[in-house]
Swiss-Prot record:
It is an enzyme of class 1 (oxidoreductase). This is Probable malonic semialdehyde reductase RutE. Keywords: Flavoprotein, FMN, NAD, NADP, Oxidoreductase. It holds the Pfam family Nitroreductase. It comes from Enterobacter sp. (strain 638). Its cofactor is FMN. The gene is rutE. GO terms for biological process: nitrogen utilization; uracil catabolic process. InterPro entries: Nitroreductase (IPR029479), Nitroreductase-like (IPR000415), Nitroreductase_HadB/RutE (IPR050461), RutE-like (IPR023936). May reduce toxic product malonic semialdehyde to 3-hydroxypropionic acid, which is excreted. CDD domains: RutE-like (cd02148). Belongs to the nitroreductase family. HadB/RutE subfamily. Its EC number is 1.1.1.298. GO terms for molecular function: 3-hydroxypropionate dehydrogenase (NADP+) activity. It catalyses: 3-hydroxypropanoate + NADP(+) = 3-oxopropanoate + NADPH + H(+).
């Protein structure tokens, strides 16, 4: 059994971490992006399917390519962020299952059911996006996840001719706390949970 993490770590990952809308002018290195991935990849997915594929948009040219897909409320903060991660899912993720899950013929579970494959890829890539957020926080970075964008435009701009489809965007950098909104409430245990 693992030991509980420290209260300080809990604050870093959960209770004092915030969604950021403004960014300090501090770059995020490619080495740091590798560190983020090398942490997040260990988060669990069903049958170790690991369907998420990530494009780290970090150049002015990349941001301009992303611009037409962004909602007006997400435009300025995304263009200002050092990095925007496009979290996508591979619609043919199951082709890697003989390598990732060699305990049986897991590939056939999904080749025989396209609907199951899509549902599995979308759900598990969303889980992996959460792991990316926690990996960023563990490394001292801040994030701003967003679903306010045109997925079709992102897919056309970045994934034409591939098996990838976008799920969500996550801005990554060193946040400007002066631009953080006031802390919003969360649902209580009684409101959100049941015991049976």
């Amino acid at each position: 059994m693992s030991e509980a993490i420290t209260p300080t770590a809990m604050k870093t990952l959960f209770t004092e971490a915030r969604t950021h809308n403004g960014w300090q002018e501090m770059p995020v290195s490619d080495e740091t992006l590798r560190e983020i991935y090398d942490l997040m990849k260990w988060g669990p997915t069903s049958a170790n399917c690991s369907p998420a594929r990530i494009v780290f948009v970090r150049t002015p040219e990349g941001k301009e390519k992303l611009r037409p897909s962004l909602s007006s409320g997400n435009l300025a903060k995304t263009l200002a962020a050092p990095v925007t991660a496009i979290i996508a899912w591979d619609s043919e993720f199951y082709e890697r299952l003989p390598e990732l899950f060699p305990h049986g013929d897991a590939r056939s579970w999904f080749t025989s059911s396209p609907a199951l494959a899509e549902e599995t890829a979308f759900r598990n890539s969303a889980m992996q996006a959460a792991y990316l957020i926690f990996a960023c926080r563990a490394l001292g970075l801040d994030t701003g996840p967003m679903s306010g964008f045109d997925r079709q435009k992102v897919d056309e701009a970045f994934f034409t001719g591939t098996t990838l489809k976008s799920n969500l965007l996550i801005n990554i950098g060193y946040g400007d706390f002066s631009k953080v909104y006031g802390r919003l409430p969360r649902l209580s245990f009684e409101d959100a949970c049941g015991l049976v």
